[in-house]
């Protein structure tokens, strides 16, 4: 059985989408992310209300997504994990299928290997609510694998924000990728803080996680 690599999308493999929306739409409050706010559900209620107040439907956001590319070398990093290090890559993201669709193609990731959320859209095309893939946190996905007796020895997890902490706790090797000062300051000492994909690859090689 391949080892598992549980990886976040925004801030790790792709840019922070809401920061892009904030800049293009000129709504500074949309730039707030889980690097600053730990309570994701409260953050999403705040974002949805902002979009409604500014009359921004989902199709507007989807159009803006087309302007964004995955992070440089992200695809090559994933291919290296899969082909050279023999990891099975699983995406665990608090983003939404409706926004991530173009990136699955860019990164050569099967959508079946992703655990994301969905938007609930009203008849006028505006985001009304969130249909959550899980209730408590990203760790729930890993716990499900544990319950199914899937071998997770030497598995890794990569995230960048507070909402990634719970999944990083459950693997042998947890990486914080380019964390903010606030996230870094409040993270457990045993999380590995890295600034590049190459640092992760080097760590896996040096520690023979292959």
Tell me the role of every PLM-derived stretch.
Residues 73-76, 141-144, 199:
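Well-ordered alpha-helical segments embedded in enzymatic catalytic cores
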Residues 93-94, 153-195:
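Acidic, Mg2+-coordinating phosphoryl-transfer loop and its flanking beta/alpha structural elements
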Residues 101-155:
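Substrate-recognition "cap/lid" segment bordering the active-site pocket of phosphatases
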Residues 114-121, 179-183, 196-200:
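Short, acidic/turn-prone active-site loops that include or flank metal/cofactor-
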Residues 1-2, 204-210:
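Short, Lys/Arg-enriched, disordered terminal segments
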């Amino acid at each position: 059985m391949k080892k598992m690599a549980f990886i976040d999308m925004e801030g790790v493999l792709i840019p922070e989408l809401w920061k892009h929306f904030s800049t293009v739409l000129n709504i500074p409050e949309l730039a707030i992310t889980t690097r600053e706010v730990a309570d994701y559900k409260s953050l999403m209620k705040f974002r949805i209300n902002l979009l409604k107040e500014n009359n921004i439907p989902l199709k507007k956001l989807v159009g803006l997504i087309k302007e964004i590319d995955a992070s440089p070398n992200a695809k090559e990093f994933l291919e290296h994990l899969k082909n050279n290090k023999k990891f099975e890559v699983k995406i665990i993201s608090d983003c939404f299928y409706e926004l991530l669709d173009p990136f699955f193609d860019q990164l050569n990731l099967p959508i079946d290997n992703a655990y994301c959320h969905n938007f609930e859209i009203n008849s006028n095309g505006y985001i009304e609510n969130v249909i959550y893939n899980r209730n408590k946190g990203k760790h729930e996905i890993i716990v499900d694998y544990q319950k199914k007796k899937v071998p997770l020895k030497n598995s890794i997890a990569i995230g960048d924000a507070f909402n990634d902490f719970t999944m990083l706790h459950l693997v042998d090797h947890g990486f914080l990728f380019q964390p903010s000062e606030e996230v870094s300051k409040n993270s457990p000492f045993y999380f590995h803080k890295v600034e590049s994909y190459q640092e992760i690859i080097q760590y896996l090689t040096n520690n023979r996680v292959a």
